[in-house]
Amino acid sequence: MALSSPVSPSLAKTNPASSTLDEGQRGSYWITTFGCQMNKADSERMAGILETMGYQEANAELDADLVLYNTCTIRDNAEQKVYSYLGRQAIRKRTNPNLTLVVAGCVAQQEGESLLRRVPELDLVMGPQHANRLETLLTQVQAGQQVVATEDHHILEDLTTARRDSSTCAWVNVIYGCNERCTYCVVPSVRGKEQSRLPESILLEMEGLAARGFKEITLLGQNIDAYGRDLPGITAEGRRQHTLTDLLHQVHDVEGIERLRFATSHPRYFTERLIDACADLPKVCEHFHIPFQSGDNELLKAMARGYTVERYRRIIDRIRKRMPDAAISADVIVAFPGETDAQYRRTLALIEEIGFDQVNTAAYSPRPNTPAADWNNQLSEEVKVARLQEINALVESTAKERNARYAGRIEQVLAEGMNPKDPSQLMGRTRTNRLTFFSAESPQGITHRAGDLVDVRIDQVRSFSLTGTPVIN
């Protein structure tokens, strides 16, 4: 199928939704986002495109003239949730043919034209590489055709004006795609090969965000510490000219940006040079998300992760040597095919040994077009549930223990907005990424707002959040 072409004649049909795209009659839109930060950033860009086209955000999904699902296929339950949502909208479209129905993201990339067979009410199916092309693709829908855009595509530089969900913190994509071949992971097949943005483009976007009042930037990539591998240039020292370390130095001094973060990191590429830069650059926050996936070397080899438990330990040791208070978060998979009880226990032991601040846990989920899905040593659902429950309990207790050391301390918190459960409180995050709630008004009568950097004395700790009182230092 040609890039972003109308579907084959057997599926083609006149598209009543085209009438909602006439100039000056754009109507309203609704975007539901599933999955990772990359998807959230893509959704913000697509929302910006829609608003540039003249759409306005709807008050509710059922009120929208255009509904877009930005989907995730990392696990089966996320994918099935998408089909549940689509089923409801398909019913709605049968009585409202002018509704425009779009599926974007990783499920769209994985399923392609077959999505139209399963949900013939769809107008547009588009993979994540095509997020910046939404206006062009909707123009094709306007011409009266169902459109599929899932071919490999050079991602346009991020020049779209995103509609940011926050007025304080922003995501900036710096590298798209992934060249790894982890045996359980569908991401490379749905997000394509690595494509790094040019540093000048990233810097320009960050300067624009600073001018709009944003205070914190998270640099995003599926495999961010591989940034620059696809860009040309070798230094006099014989290393790559473009690395994440170099990028941090290049963007660090953007005036108005107070904090820098980055995610997600791969242990294979997390270097001492990167750690030293994070320790030396004052705007880089002391929080690192570095998935380890398993505490057993045989399983790491089966996963094709490309590192050992010993290397992972050395990375964490180096981080804590340079930044003793640094927070470490991670991802882990339990019940990977063939995982023995002893191997699983090694994962539990590593969590206790490292003392993670947060761990995202998941039971292994077979995904299409991945080697591990075809192996004959799959574990039962009963084992998956039992191991997931046990590891979740350990993760929560470890997180609470790590949080306990904050009691009584004064932490700098970037206020991000109002606590939705208590309008008298603001919520924000410490440099170590602790979610923190505090009174919008200090005892001295100072009223704080989103965007303020506030010194907060921590009065109460929970497993995954802190509560405190603003203070004047």
Curated annotation (Swiss-Prot):
[4Fe-4S] cluster 1 binds at residues 36, 72, 106. InterPro entries: Elp3/MiaA/NifB-like_rSAM, Methylthiotransferase, Methylthiotransferase_CS, Methylthiotransferase_N, Methylthiotransferase_N_sf, MiaB_methiolase, rSAM, rSAM_horseshoe. Residues 27-143 form the MTTase N-terminal domain. Residues 404-472 form the TRAM domain. Residues 1-23 are annotated as: Disordered. Residues 1-22 have a biased composition (Polar residues). It is an enzyme of class 2 (transferase). SMART domains: Elp3. [4Fe-4S] cluster 2 binds at residues 178, 182, 185. SUPFAM superfamilies: Radical SAM enzymes. It is found in: Cytoplasm. Residues 164-401 form the Radical SAM core domain. It catalyses: N(6)-dimethylallyladenosine(37) in tRNA + (sulfur carrier)-SH + AH2 + 2 S-adenosyl-L-methionine = 2-methylsulfanyl-N(6)-dimethylallyladenosine(37) in tRNA + (sulfur carrier)-H + 5'-deoxyadenosine + L-methionine + A + S-adenosyl-L-homocysteine + 2 H(+). Monomer. Catalyzes the methylthiolation of N6-(dimethylallyl)adenosine (i(6)A), leading to the formation of 2-methylthio-N6-(dimethylallyl)adenosine (ms(2)i(6)A) at position 37 in tRNAs that read codons beginning with uridine. This is tRNA-2-methylthio-N(6)-dimethylallyladenosine synthase. It comes from Synechococcus sp. (strain CC9311). The gene is miaB.
